[in-house]
């Protein structure tokens, strides 16, 4: 505090005090809008660049890549600089640091601020080269904290942000590598499955072709068998026609004649039995008439008194039995011929049988 009684301080006291560092030029007043709006429309120089010192050439500013990298780092850390400064504040040296003002002022005067270097956009630089460019010794950082605490905080925040960015990048690379390995494994599995499916498809296609060929062969064999059966049927019919067993005109009625032949033997047997009974009755009537028309009355009387006995009638029937059996055999033979020739000879045979029975009865009556 100045003494109001001594408005002019002692010059010796002033000479003993170390020279104070000049206060930094205050930044121009910005508008109410966000500071990042300026970076989106125009390029601005970094704030840590000291324009008051003499310009030594473009080599001291660094390359265009360095300027662009610093610009990208400042824009990236604009939103998180406050929190980073709060976290770095307690650990960073403050105005009451052990460094004296004299050393700080001298070193600050001798040291020249350098341009910051950061990661390049393509990320081709290594960590060693980055640290070599942007690293600052702790004593210099302490001196800078005395001179420009805002700049020191920004440097610390940039270092922390670079470390976090590097960590995120490493994690992202690891994740991409893991995804690539997973996709390669899936591709290998799918390739194996595709090979199996292709082999199965090839096998099924060949089997399908073989089955189609076998089906065609079976169809051809069936057609050949049908044609062979037709030829055999025609050959059998031709042989029958050649041997005379079946005439061409009666070939159509061959099946019906065979069915009639199966029924004719039973019908012929019953008809012949009925015919024998009828013949026996006719024989009795004729015998009775014969005795009635005898010229001799004595004989008529004797015949009346002594009629033919049953034994005589049976003897007469037995004597006529061979003729009747012969007629039955002839009728069966004629029936067989009628079946082969498709003619109804059975009725004719029966008619002839009746004719023969009439002849036998007439011969017996003449006797």
Swiss-Prot record:
UniProt-annotated stretches for the region Leucine-zipper? 176-190
Residue ranges annotated for the bZIP domain, each copy included: 148-211
* Alphabetically ordered keywords of this record: Coiled coil, Cytoplasm, DNA-binding, Nucleus, Phosphoprotein, Transcription, Transcription regulation
Can you list the GO cellular component terms from the UniProt entry?
Answer: cytoplasm; nucleoplasm; nucleus; perinuclear region of cytoplasm
Q: Where is the composition biased (Polar residues)?
A: 294-309, 317-328, 354-367
PANTHER family linked to this entry = BZIP TRANSCRIPTION FACTOR 18, TRANSCRIPTION FACTOR POSF21-RELATED
The name under which this protein is listed is: bZIP transcription factor 18
Source organism of this protein record = Arabidopsis thaliana
- Which lineage? Eukaryota, Viridiplantae, Streptophyta, Embryophyta, Tracheophyta
């Amino acid at each position: 505090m100045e003494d109001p009684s001594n408005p002019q301080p002692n010059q010796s006291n002033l000479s003993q005090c170390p020279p104070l560092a000049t206060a930094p030029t205050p930044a121009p007043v910005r508008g109410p809008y966000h500071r990042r709006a300026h970076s989106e429309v125009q390029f601005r120089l970094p704030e840590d660049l000291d324009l008051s010192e003499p310009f030594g050439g473009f080599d001291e500013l660094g390359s265009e890549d360095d300027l662009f990298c610093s610009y990208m780092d400042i824009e990236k850390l604009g939103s998180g600089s406050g929190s980073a400064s709060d976290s770095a504040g307690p650990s960073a040296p403050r105005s009451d640091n052990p460094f004296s003002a004299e050393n700080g002022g001298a070193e600050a005067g001798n040291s020249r601020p350098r341009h910051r270097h950061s990661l390049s956009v393509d990320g081709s630089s290594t960590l060693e080269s980055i640290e070599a460019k942007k690293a600052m010794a702790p004593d210099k950082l302490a001196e800078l904290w005395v001179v420009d605490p805002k700049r020191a905080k920004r440097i610390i925040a940039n270092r922390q942000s670079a470390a976090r960015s590097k960590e995120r990048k490493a994690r992202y690379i690891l994740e991409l590598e893991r995804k690539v390995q997973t996709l390669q494994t899936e591709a290998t599995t799918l390739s194996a499955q595709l090979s199996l499916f292709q082999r199965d498809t090839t096998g099924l296609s060949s089997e399908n072709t073989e089955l189609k060929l076998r089906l065609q062969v079976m169809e051809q064999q069936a057609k050949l068998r049908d044609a062979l059966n037709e030829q055999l049927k025609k050959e059998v019919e031709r042989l029958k026609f050649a041997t005379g067993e079946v005439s061409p005109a009666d070939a159509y009625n061959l099946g019906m004649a065979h069915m009639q032949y199966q029924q004719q033997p039973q019908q012929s047997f019953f008809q012949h039995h009925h015919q024998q009974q009828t013949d026996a009755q006719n024989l009795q009537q004729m015998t009775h008439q014969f005795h009635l028309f005898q010229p001799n009355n004595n004989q008529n009387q004797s015949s009346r008194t002594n009629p033919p006995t049953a034994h005589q009638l049976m003897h007469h029937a037995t004597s006529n039995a061979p003729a009747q059996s012969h007629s039955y055999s002839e009728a069966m033979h004629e029936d067989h011929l009628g079946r082969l020739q498709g003619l109804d000879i059975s009725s004719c045979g029966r008619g002839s049988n009746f004719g023969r029975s009439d002849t036998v009865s007439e011969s017996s009556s003449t006797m």
